[in-house]
């Protein structure tokens, strides 16, 4: 009996012992996973991961009722798979998959690296797998063994190469598939997924899909979300897509789709979000009139015709409508946007007519009302005067009329108000003073009248005011002088009277001032002479009297028009290039259409005094003759030696953007071959030393056809021949740089132009370029890592400013180390904007077509090879190359990289091996050992920047943020000074 009881007890304890053994193995497997991460900022996650606890007590672990691990959830924990020695290691999928009952594995939204490996296929109980938003490399393994898988998220995971679509064909339970935003090679739509009829969500955007959407898409009848944007999909939208009646979201924007919306598209009545923008679709929108559940509709930049369906006015969920740049006609539905929290409408650049719907801000959340360049008529609705959430209101170039509701002027969040080129009338009321966010006010070409409100000074964010071609009367308020940010004030062609406010001299940012065609009187205020940035001054067609202020002579104006006034006295010699017609009281010996200034009347004097004056005149004449003779001899010698004469000062036009303490002839005389400090595809750069001791850099823009031999004469150096082909490039650089003020962007003082030459005058950078310091002075001096890190961050901030800090983003198009200059304190400055492209402010699609490949070999982004559409991400790629130069010390093109390789391919090829030691070998040997860990972090950022896919590259804002987060290694465990020390301090220690 006792023996029987013993056997029964033994049989009872055996499963318990087995269970304890299994649980112990699970703990060991999880601790092996933990060891992969080493010391991490997410140590809190692993505090409970110790031998003292069971696996079920580990944070992020879920067990079943038997105590077996069924879920690992470590998503969004900032995890990096780097061991205690700092080496990157592959995740131990063999240990993970030894958890035999594991059903859910979530490691998404971390910073995991390395290859995923074939051991993943051993997790054959998995139902849910999320590895998305990481930095993995290499190809994804076949997962045909994961027959129970229902959820697969790999988007933006870093995987590349050929995706194993064939291994998905038998995953019949798969309902969620997200593999977009990865660097796959070009491939057609994966037909293997067309038989996975359980699919409800498919995200394949930005995954290099080419060709057509197959007819077999009709098989996925349970689909609720289909996203195929940012690919190279062509052909028509297949008619079979209308069978996907459960679709709630369809995004196919930024492809090459053509044709019309297929018949039967109306059957997709569950559709809430539909975006087919930036394609070449045609036809009308009639198929959409039955989709009453739409929340967001985007079809901008297509070739759509016909009317906007009136049924849109009854859609009770529609909150965003973007149809700009099509050929749509007819009227907008009156009740459009009245049923829900409508936020956004852009129907600009169509042929729409009728009245503006009045109820789009009924719920009080609307931010954008954009309807410019149509044929709208009628009054602007009163209802929008209460729309306090509006940020941009643009209805210019229509046929609208009537009065603007006074509340519009004072909307507190409005940044851009554009009512130009309509038939509006009435007053600009004092409510404008409440528009604290308003930066641009354009009321030009309307019928507004009344006086200008003095309260406008309350709108102290104003940068641009354009009220031209209206019927405003009365005086120009002195309160304009309080607008410190004002850059452009255009009031021409009105009925303004009185004096020009002296207070305008306080608007020190003014560049453009136009009061032409009014009835302004009295004298031109002397205070205008203090506007050192003023570039254009037009006061023509008024009743101004008195003399031209001497202070205007100091300004470097590209346009000065004082014609048709009542001015008297002589025209200052430095202003003779301006326009002064219609001023009978003006005189000048150098302006042919003005009478000569009188020399003075002779007075009756004694003979002796008369003779004395004659003698004096004779002496002065003799001195002048000798002077001119001497000058002629010197001039002839120089001409014989240099083969050309110096151009006359009056031939030059100077446009200044900052306070100048030099004149143009000081610059021109120094344009000599011996002063050349740089040569480029756009022209030479000269070092110019002024009499004041200041040093400047002058860039001479040349045309491609002109010869660039080593001339000796300053005039020969400036001779460009037929340079009309260069005007666009020169004007692009001036327009860009004149508006830029940033510590990490080179400062432009002025431009100097004449009929056959163009000069740009910059601040001089005494430490040359980053290229010179890295590649041409090795052996003489080595730049330490702290300096390199400071240079990387500073240059990134400069480029971030160009992309994100201006009203209109600027694409540099030639970012390279030789265009990053170093000032006397070793601060980096982005330079050379001859290739810059300013993107139009109101374009949502910010790509542009480049007629020719621009840039420098080794820095050119790969998308130039297959498209003419480039954007800021092309600059990001080039900046990534610069980061690689900083870390490796290598040039972008070197024989060490092998045939047909460059620095990007070289670094990427090593990074795919996921061997930390190999990555460390990429780092410049001159970088101190204690900083190599930080250098490796910067190299990781460089890899992100040089991703083959433009969409996968970060924006410069993100690049700056990542660089700022790199905590210097030397400061982690010591009391040394923080990274905030200037690079100049460090250069004295290292160089």
Swiss-Prot record:
LRR repeat locations: 66-90, 99-123, 125-148, 150-170, 171-196, 197-220, 221-244, 246-267, 269-291, 292-314, 315-339, 341-363, 365-387, 388-411, 413-435, 436-459, 461-482, 483-508, 510-531, 532-554, 555-578
Q: Which InterPro entries match?
A: Kinase-like_dom_sf, Leu-rich_rpt, Leu-rich_rpt_typical-subtyp, LRR_dom_sf, LRR_N_plant-typ, LRR_R13L4/SHOC2-like, Plant_LRR-RLKs, Prot_kinase_dom
Note down the stretches annotated as region Disordered: 972-991
Enzyme Commission numbers on file = 2.7.11.1
Q: In which tissues is it expressed?
A: Expressed in the endosperm of fertilized ovules.
Residues holding ATP: 677-685, 699
Cytoplasmic side, ranges: 638-991
**Pfam families on file:** LRR_1, LRR_14, LRR_8, LRRNT_2, Pkinase
Membrane topology (UniProt): Single-pass membrane protein
Q: PTM Phosphothreonine: at which residues?
A: 867
Q: Which GO terms describe its biological process?
A: endosperm development
Per the annotation, which location comes first and is thus the protein's main one?
membrane
Q: Where does the record place the modification Phosphotyrosine?
A: 762, 801, 859, 866
Report domain Protein kinase positions. Answer: 671-970
Q: What SMART domains would the database entry show?
A: LRR_TYP, S_TKc
Reaction equation(s) it catalyzes: L-seryl-[protein] + ATP = O-phospho-L-seryl-[protein] + ADP + H(+); L-threonyl-[protein] + ATP = O-phospho-L-threonyl-[protein] + ADP + H(+)
| Name assigned to this protein | Receptor-like protein kinase HAIKU2
Q: Which organism is it from?
A: Arabidopsis thaliana (Mouse-ear cress)
């Amino acid at each position: 009996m006792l023996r029987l009881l013993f056997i029964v007890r033994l049989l009872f304890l055996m499963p318990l012992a087995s269970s304890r053994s299994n649980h112990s193995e699970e703990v060991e497997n999880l601790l092996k996973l933990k060891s992969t991460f080493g010391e991490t900022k997410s140590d809190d996650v692993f505090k409970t991961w110790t031998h003292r606890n069971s696996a079920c007590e580990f944070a992020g672990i879920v067990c079943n009722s038997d105590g077996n691990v069924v879920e690992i959830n470590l998503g969004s924990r900032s995890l990096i798979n780097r061991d205690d020695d700092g080496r990157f290691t592959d995740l131990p999928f063999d240990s993970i998959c030894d958890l035999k009952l594991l059903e859910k594995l979530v490691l998404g939204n971390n910073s995991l690296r390395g290859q995923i490996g074939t051991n993943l296929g051993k997790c054959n109980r998995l139902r849910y797998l999320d590895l998305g938003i990481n930095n993995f490399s290499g190809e994804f393994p076949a997962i045909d063994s994961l027959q129970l898988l229902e959820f697969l998220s790999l988007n933006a995971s870093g995987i590349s190469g050929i995706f194993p679509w064939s291994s998905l064909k038998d995953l019949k339970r798969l309902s969620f598939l997200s593999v977009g935003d990865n660097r796959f090679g070009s491939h057609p739509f994966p037909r293997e997924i067309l038989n996975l009829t359980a699919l409800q969500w498919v995200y394949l955007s930005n995954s290099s899909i080419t060709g057509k959407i197959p007819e077999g898409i009709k098989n996925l009848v349970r689909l609720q979300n289909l996203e195929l944007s940012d690919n190279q999909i062509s052909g028509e939208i297949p008619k079979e897509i209308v069978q996907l009646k459960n679709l709630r979201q369809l995004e196919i924007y930024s492809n090459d789709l053509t044709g019309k919306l297929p018949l039967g598209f109306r059957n997709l009545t569950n559709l809430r979000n539909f975006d087919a923008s930036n394609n070449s679709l045609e036809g009308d929108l009639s198929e959409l009139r039955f989709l009453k559940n739409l929340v967001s509709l985007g079809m901008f930049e297509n070739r759509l015709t016909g009317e906007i369906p009136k049924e849109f006015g009854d859609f009770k969920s529609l909150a965003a409508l973007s149809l700009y740049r099509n050929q749509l006609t007819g009227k907008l539905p009156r009740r459009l946007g009245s049923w829900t929290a409508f936020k956004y409408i852009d129907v600009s650049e169509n042929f729409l007519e009728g009245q503006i719907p009045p109820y789009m801000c009924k719920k009080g959340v609307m931010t954008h009302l954009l309807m410019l360049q149509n044929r709208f008529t009628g009054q602007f609705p009163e209802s929008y005067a209460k729309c306090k959430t509006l940020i941009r209101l643009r209805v210019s170039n229509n046929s609208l009329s009537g009065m603007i509701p006074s509340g519009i002027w004072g909307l507190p969040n409005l940044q851009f108000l554009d009512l130009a080129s309509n038939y509006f009338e009435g007053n600009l009321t004092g409510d404008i003073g409440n528009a604290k966010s308003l930066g641009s006010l354009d009321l030009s070409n309307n019928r507004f009248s009344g006086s200008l409100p003095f309260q406008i000074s309350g709108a102290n964010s104003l940068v641009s005011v354009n009220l031209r071609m209206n019927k405003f009367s009365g005086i120009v308020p002195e309160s304009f002088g309080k607008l410190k940010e004002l850059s452009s004030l255009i009031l021409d062609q009105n009925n303004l009277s009185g004096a020009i406010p002296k207070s305008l001299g306080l608007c020190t940012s003014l560049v453009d001032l136009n009061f032409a065609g009014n009835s302004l009187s009295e004298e031109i205020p002397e205070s205008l002479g203090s506007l050192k940035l003023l570039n254009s001054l037009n006061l023509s067609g008024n009743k101004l009297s008195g003399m031209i202020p001497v202070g205007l002579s100091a300004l470097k104006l590209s346009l000065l028009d004082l014609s048709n006034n009542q001015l008297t006295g002589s025209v200052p010699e430095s202003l003779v290039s301006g326009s002064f017609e219609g001023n009978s009281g003006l005189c000048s010996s150098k302006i042919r259409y003005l009478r000569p200034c009188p020399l003075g009347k002779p007075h009756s004097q004694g003979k002796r005094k008369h003779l004395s004056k004659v003698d004096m005149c004779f002496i002065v004449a003799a001195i002048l003759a000798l002077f001119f003779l001497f000058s002629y001899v010197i001039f002839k010698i120089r001409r014989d030696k240099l083969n050309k004469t110096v151009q006359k000062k009056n031939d030059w036009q100077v446009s200044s953007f900052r306070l100048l303490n030099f004149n143009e002839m000081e610059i021109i005389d120094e344009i000599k071959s011996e002063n050349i400090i740089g040569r480029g595809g756009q022209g030479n750069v000269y070092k110019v030393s002024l009499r004041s001791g200041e040093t400047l850099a002058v860039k001479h823009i040349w045309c491609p056809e002109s010869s660039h031999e080593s001339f000796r004469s300053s005039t020969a150096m400036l001779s460009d021949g037929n340079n009309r082909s260069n005007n666009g490039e020169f004007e692009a650089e001036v327009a860009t740089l004149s508006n830029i003020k940033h510590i990490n962007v080179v400062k432009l003082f002025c431009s100097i132009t004449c009929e056959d030459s163009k000069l740009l005058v910059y601040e001089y950078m005494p430490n040359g370029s980053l290229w010179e310091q890295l590649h041409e002075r090795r052996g003489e001096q080595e730049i330490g890592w702290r300096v390199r890190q400071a240079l990387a961050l500073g240059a990134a901030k400069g480029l971030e400013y160009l992309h994100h800090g201006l009203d209109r983003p600027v694409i540099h198009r030639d970012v390279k180390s030789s265009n990053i200059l170093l000032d006397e304190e070793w601060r980096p400055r982005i330079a050379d904007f001859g290739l810059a492209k300013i993107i139009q402010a109101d374009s949502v699609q910010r790509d542009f077509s480049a007629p020719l490949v621009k840039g420098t070999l080794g820095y050119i982004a790969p998308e130039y090879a297959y498209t003419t559409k480039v954007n800021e991400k092309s600059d990001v790629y080039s900046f990534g190359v610069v980061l690689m130069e900083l870390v490796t010390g290598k040039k972008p093109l070197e024989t060490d990289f092998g045939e047909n390789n460059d620095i990007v391919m070289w670094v990427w090829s090593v990074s795919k091996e996921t061997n930390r030691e190999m990555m460390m070998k990429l780092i410049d040997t001159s970088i101190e050992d204690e900083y190599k860990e930080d250098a490796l972090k910067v190299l990781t950022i460089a890899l992100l920047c040089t991703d083959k896919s433009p969409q996968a590259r970060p924006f410069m804002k993100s690049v700056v943020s990542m660089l700022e987060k790199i905590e210097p290694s030397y400061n982690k465990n010591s009391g040394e000074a923080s990274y905030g020390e200037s690079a100049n301090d460090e250069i004295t220690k290292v160089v």
